[in-house]
Amino acid sequence: MTLILYNTLSRREEPFTPLIPGIVSMYCCGITVYDYCHLGHARTCVVWDVVRRYLEYLGYKVRYIQNFTDIDDKILNRAKNEHTTMAAVAERFIEAYFEDMAKLGVRPADAYPRATHTLDGIKRLVYELEQKGYAYPSDGDVYYSVRRFSDYGKLSGRKLDDLQAGASGRVETDDPEAIKKQDPFDFALWKGAKSGEPSWDSPWGQGRPGWHIECSAMVKEQLGETIDIHVGGSDLIFPHHENEIAQSEAATGKPLAHYWLHNGMVKVAGEKMSKSLGNFITIRELLAKYDPLAVRLLILGAQYRKPIDFSDEGLQAATNGWHTLQEGLSFGYKHLPPDNPAITDQELENRFQEAVNHDFNFAGGLAVLFEIAKELRKEGNNLTHAGKTDSNLAQLAVKWHTLVKLSRVLGLEMAADQGETPVSEGISAADIENLIQQRTEAKKAKNYAESDRIRAELKAQGITLIDQPGGVTKWLREGD
């Protein structure tokens, strides 16, 4: 069975073939860390988490990178309003992000590069674009000359000649930078320093990077000049991903990514989510009312490229669905010996793969899981009330192991203690201290991506790190 993906770049479905057989490089545009994550972030992170899990299930070794944008006007504005620093705001919401993702069952990325940790690479890339004639300095800023890149618009399908400045949401007629630009569609690669804002030294003077160049530099630094899969929300297609392509491909002369995948946007009770409509919901607010895995199930039940509607009715239906899966998943813990062999049903796995291989049709894969879960629920009731089953117990064991395996692929895992089987208390204190030491060494070596990865790994296991003055790190286990 061949994995088929819808490629935004080609606007058609294509068979997936990685650059290197058996290995997949994957980059996700992450969050700008100025506030708590909302429903849109939940969908994006869950979808690409499951895509990564599924690729690994198929046997690929996946290197998955997700960035943090920690230099941005929104972060600066919040820092000014709270009389604190940009770094303090970023750290607070990065920590909050890890907490939210751990609750949703999103596995940590292999690295979390940040703009502030990639400044040398950003400046090198801007310099290279300037040397090749794709960028020009102007009064302390550096701009990308969009019309120099003949393929501009190939991802979004937008052509510059068809756009009017001020009408696209991309260029504002009262843009204060307009006087500095050679063309109204040019965008900033480097912004000159402003009073009261953080800035860094560069060949063009003190300043900070523009948003789009950050991701181009981080992709190159973490994964190379060309990657297999670049993902993100559909709202990033234009201008962000379009500009990433323009920057990276002008610099290298090579494709930035072979496959561009985008998840659809979020609606709340049929309306676009926005603060002005009063329906803006954070992940924390949502998880105060609903089981995180019910939220995950709702997300996976929708076609990932289409809009999804979060409503109380939909979330209640997803909650009921998660209860059904839980009842099926609990069968083995309640009714099977702990040493029964982990044999799975290949025919059921084939049906699961056949569904999901068609452009990540997770809903089709879930249908297979529900079929198994409902049978196991029925047979579990038979065992509880009649002491016997309609099917052979060995066959039911095979189906249960299949359900556990495929549920894990979708991140719909139930702890053994929920099935009335004792489990250990998790990662040991010694292992925690060992990882903290590794994180300390990474920070000393200025390997901040590894430091973030270790913190995320511990957070996923219910461990919160608290950095204190003097380089001391304390930890708390969830529930302590």
Swiss-Prot record:
SUPFAM superfamilies: Anticodon-binding domain of a subclass of class I aminoacyl-tRNA synthetases, Nucleotidylyl transferase. Keywords: Aminoacyl-tRNA synthetase, ATP-binding, Cytoplasm, Ligase, Metal-binding, Nucleotide-binding, Protein biosynthesis, Zinc. This is Cysteine--tRNA ligase. GO terms for biological process: cysteinyl-tRNA aminoacylation. Binds 1 zinc ion per subunit. Transmembrane segments: none annotated. The gene is cysS. A motif ('HIGH' region) lies at residues 31-41. It comes from Microcystis aeruginosa (strain NIES-843 / IAM M-2473). Its EC number is 6.1.1.16.
